[in-house]
Structures are given as structure tokens and as C-alpha cells.
Amino acid sequence: MADNYIAVIDGSTSKTPKHYHPTMRNGRYAMTLISDFLRQAPASLSVTEFCYRVTQVIHQAYPLDDSQPRRSPEQRLCASAVVCSLLRKEIWMIGDCQCMVDGHLYTNDKPSEAPIAEERSRLFPTLQAEHPDMVRDGRIVHDYARDAILPKLIASMQGENRTYAVIDGFDIFMPGVKVITLRQDEPHDIVLASDGYPFLRPTLKDSENALREQIANDPYNIHTFKATKGLMQGNVSFDDRALIRFRLSK
């Protein structure tokens, strides 16, 4: 939370060993840079101005002599964000994120991810039969199905800021940015969340309960919720998750 903005920022899982910060993974570093920017950003920014300025912030984190990020999207700092501008009464959805406004769900899914997740769900039972050590006690020890789809996940990143929007230090694909304009003359109950919640609900309690039910019934994410990764051994959920709920007065 900042004076003028409320946001949930989700750094993308690194798909490369290359790091741009000595102590932080790329996704966390991107999240930190965006968060710091929002704390001092002018209240009056439009979504276009925000996208331009936050892109500059990330781009400046790349070494001047490093051309890899331009050539290879998997080498980039990358994050998704759902941002509420308190002055403009708008919600900006950039990348894979979700929100609820007065009980109505809005999503901004990556277009290429659903078919890749579907492929993983088809492969998982076969590979589990081939590798008995793949799972233990309802947790994935090694996800051979994810290994199989990883080349497609990396290839899909070629669409980054070409066919879908993310914050990665290069011009944001504005047709992929979703803007929700809130009515100025009435209050709103708002939930902003990362994609770590498979089923977003109007409250944290209900969202957590839905997550627990998914973990109990489909921990590998191959049936009721198909995803590109499941519950790994040693983890308590499928992915990092963040949620903030607030009431915006008129």
C-alpha cells in the first residue's frame, strides 16, 4: 500500500539461472523495484503514464552492456501487477493477476498458459506411472510433467509484450492491459490478488478455504484446476500468493 495506490505485485518465477541482484531472485527483485516506484509515484498518473514510467524503472536495472534481455524474454526481470489508483478510481491489470469488484471477478490470464497446463495434466498420470518416485504423500518430489512442458513455457515467453502484457523493462503491450473504471458516486468493495489463488473469493477466509480444498482434492493441479505446476514437497501451496481487500469510499 502507498499513499496514492494499492497494489498486489507478483514477480515471475525465474526460468534462468541469471540473476540481476546479488541476493534476490529476478521475480522478487522486479517486485521490489515496482513497489518502491509506487510509493513515490505521483497520484495523477494515468495507466499509460504508469506503464511508461515503471518500464523505465525496470529497464534501468539491466546492465548497459547486456543485450540478452532484449533477445531472450526468459532473461528478463518480470512481474505482473494489479494496481488501484485511488485518485482516478481505476484498477489496472498488467499481466497474470485477478481482482474482484463488488463480488464480480476479473482476470487477465496469459493466453498461452491454458493449453500448456492442459498438456501437463494429460502427461502427469503417464509420467507418474513411469516414475513411481515422482510423488510422495500427496506431494510432488520431481515434476517430470513440468519438465516436459518447460520448453513450451519458455517458447511462450516470446509473446511477452507482443501478445500479452507484463512489466519487464520493455514497452508494455497496452492491448493486454485491462482497465476497470469504478463508479465515482458509490463505494466499492475491492479484492486485489495474485494468481496464487486458484479460486478467488470476496474474502481472505473464503479464498484460503477454496485453496485448501484444491490442495486436498487435486494437489497436482491436473483435474479441477489445471496449472503448469502443482504442490511440491516441502511447500504449503502451489505458488506465492498475496491478497488485499479494502473498501473504496465514494
Model-derived features with residue positions:
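PP2C/PPM-type serine/threonine phosphatase catalytic domain
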Residues: 1-250
